[in-house]
């Protein structure tokens, strides 16, 4: 019996009937129940053997962090927020356990043991002392801790006890004039903890659900104070009547709301609040958050347009890797809480499109080891493992659902029995998924039907095998039963195979300035503008134009500078698109997102147009004059993640 079950048996029912969290639409599975397969396994292995898996070996903001020494004794940090090690830990915990990598587990255990051993007598966790204490950096570290407790029961009791002790102190701090939350030392910026407080509340709700105790009423009080005291409430920001469709980054009164990473995290804030406040208001504001953000500040690749700060929908605005991973996690969380199929579609797109574009061979971000600022270096490892963990969900009392489609294997308990499912697929590069299912008891399987899918050209075939009986195959119509997009398939005890074919074709999405983005399924395609690169020693974020950092222990650490080699100023005629795909059983290159590695491509006719550069560097807003300045030509479109220089929002012309 686990520690959590012992606790639950002794104190169950102590909380007030009114103090009850709103239920998940789909409950998340414990970390480690879901493993990557196929191309997704290759990508995660590249992360483990590349930069994320070696930061603990050389990166001073990780292995010399102030978190690993006695509080107040100092260490290496890129800011006094002390967030580097917590960011890294939040991503490395699930990576280590999903891959069952003993080397990475050793790193995680070493850090967890040191940090928890330094917990102070009054409950504080972290390197700060006195008035330097503030809540923010604990948020990602605690998300790492709860994942470790789920993945490894040897850590469960120690972690739960440490968190419960911390939140007793946290409650006192909030009652003491919002100490460390809205009231910090003059040189500590409180706003990061305020605007991102929903992620801290997730840890509190995890404790309430899994480890009820005599302190539950205090935890509820803490959640309510966090919401009441913060000066930055995402539900009020996402009021359609006042939402800023175009923003001025110099307006300091709204800076926390327009920071790209904050927005990525803030998407789920109203969903987190709904879980303990209930009511239609927070559900609607959750929907507003997604609709307004992606309508006015969203990228076709699934992330948020913000060169750190939002501005408008100009095509030249980029997006941090941090923003992409936080956005995908928020959308996956929102799908589990509220069940809107659109959230799951968007979570898939953010990972399979935007996440890849910022990586080269899993070794470094596109522009370097720590381009301009180190936060993405330490924060990006959470992207893939959280996508894998959240790809399967528990449905009701006897169901298991495939929420985020892709090549994964799951081993878990459903309806009191053991269930093992292997999903073999090249999705999203192909449109078919094959499931091999073994179950010790009957259960209900749920498969998500994406909103963009053509139901008329989709199919399901189920083959059931039972001891001593011949296999029987039945076909089913594909249909989503409700807004969740889930289709229910009863599965009998024994062995079952299932073939799921998604109706897919080229999809044209209209964007600002009479431009379009081209998809096949949820996979965005970009104009192939060629690719050339040069490398150098990695540069310090504080000296990006200097000679680079020598003496690092890994020769693989390089900054890579990329450029295009073909014309980019192209307008296309979408009516001429032709798709060239691969077979369901075709082998996939590893790594899959190298330039031109995927065999999938499209062709489209177009021509060059006059199109100016902004600041002489990047394409400006698309011109209204689409007069061809060249002859008609057939161009090649390739998966966005494999195009290291991107032209995916393209003007149209009728040829």
Language-model region placement:
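A surface-exposed regulatory interaction patch that couples sensing to output
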Residues: 234-259
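C-terminal beta-rich recognition modules with glycine/proline-rich loops and embedded aromatic residues
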Residues: 286, 345-348, 353-433, 501-655
């Amino acid at each position: 019996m686990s520690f959590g079950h012992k606790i639950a048996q002794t104190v169950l029912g102590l909380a007030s009937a009114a103090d009850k969290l709103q239920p998940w639409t789909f409950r998340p599975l414990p970390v480690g129940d879901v493993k990557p397969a196929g191309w997704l396994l290759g990508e995660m292995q590249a992360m483990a053997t590349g930069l994320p898996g070696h930061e603990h070996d050389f990166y001073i903001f990780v292995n010399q962090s102030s978190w690993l020494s006695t509080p107040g004794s100092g260490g290496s940090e890129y800011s006094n927020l002390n967030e580097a090690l917590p960011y890294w830990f939040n991503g490395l915990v699930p990576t280590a356990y999903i891959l069952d990598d003993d080397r990475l587990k050793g790193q995680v255990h070493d850090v967890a043991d040191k940090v928890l051993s330094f917990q102070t007598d009054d409950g504080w966790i972290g390197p700060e002392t006195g008035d330097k204490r503030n809540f923010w950096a604990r948020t990602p570290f605690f998300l790492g801790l709860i994942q470790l407790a789920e993945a490894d029961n040897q850590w469960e009791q120690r972690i739960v006890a440490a968190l419960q002790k911390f939140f007793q102190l946290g409650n006192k701090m909030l009652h003491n004039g919002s100490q460390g939350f809205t009231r910090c030392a003059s040189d500590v910026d409180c706003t990061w903890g305020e605007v991102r407080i929903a992620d801290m509340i997730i840890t509190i709700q995890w404790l309430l659900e899994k480890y009820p105790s005599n302190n539950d009423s205090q935890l509820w009080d803490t959640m309510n104070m966090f919401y009441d005291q913060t000066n930055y409430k995402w539900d009020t920001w996402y009021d359609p009547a006042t939402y800023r469709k175009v923003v001025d980054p110099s307006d300091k009164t709204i800076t926390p709301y327009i920071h790209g990473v904050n927005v990525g995290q803030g998407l789920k804030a109203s969903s987190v609040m709904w879980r303990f406040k209930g009511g239609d208001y927070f559900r609607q504001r959750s929907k507003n958050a997604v609709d307004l953000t992606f309508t006015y500040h969203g990228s076709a690749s699934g992330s948020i347009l913000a060169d750190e700060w939002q501005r408008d929908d100009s095509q030249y605005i980029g997006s941090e890797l941090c923003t992409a991973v936080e956005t995908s996690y928020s959308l996956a969380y929102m799908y589990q809480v509220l069940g809107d199929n659109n959230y799951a579609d968007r979570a898939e797109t953010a990972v399979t499109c935007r996440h890849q574009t910022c990586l080269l061979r899993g070794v470094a971000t596109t522009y370097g080891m720590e381009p301009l600022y180190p936060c993405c270096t330490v924060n990006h490892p959470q992207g893939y493992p959280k996508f894998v963990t959240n790809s399967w969900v528990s449905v009701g009392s006897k169901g298991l659902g495939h929420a985020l489609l892709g090549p994964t294997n799951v081993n878990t308990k459903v309806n009191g029995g053991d269930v093992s499912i292997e999903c073999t697929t090249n999705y999203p590069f192909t449109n078919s998924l094959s499931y091999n299912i073994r179950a010790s008891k009957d259960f209900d399987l749920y498969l998500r039907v994406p909103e963009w899918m053509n139901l008329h050209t989709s199919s399901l075939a189920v083959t059931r095998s039972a001891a001593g009986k011949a296999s029987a195959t039945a076909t089913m119509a594909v249909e989503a039963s409700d807004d969740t997009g889930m289709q229910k398939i009863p599965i009998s005890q024994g062995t079952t195979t299932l073939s799921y074919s998604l109706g897919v074709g080229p999809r044209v999405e209209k964007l600002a300035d009479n431009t379009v983005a081209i998809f096949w399924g949820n996979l965005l395609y970009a104009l192939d503008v060629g690719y050339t690169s040069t490398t150098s020693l990695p540069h310090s974020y504080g000296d990006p134009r200097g000679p680079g950092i020598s003496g690092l222990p890994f020769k693989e650490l390089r900054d890579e500078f990329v450029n295009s080699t073909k014309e980019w100023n192209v307008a296309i005629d979408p009516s001429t698109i032709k798709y060239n795909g691969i077979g369901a059983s075709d082998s996939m290159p590893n790594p899959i997102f190298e330039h031109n590695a995927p065999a999938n491509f499209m062709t489209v006719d177009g021509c060059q147009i006059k199109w100016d550069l902004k600041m002489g560097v990047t394409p400006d807003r698309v011109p209204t004059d689409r007069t061809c300045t060249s002859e008609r030509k057939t161009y090649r479109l390739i998966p966005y993640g494999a195009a290291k220089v991107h032209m995916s929002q393209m003007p149209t012309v009728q040829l």
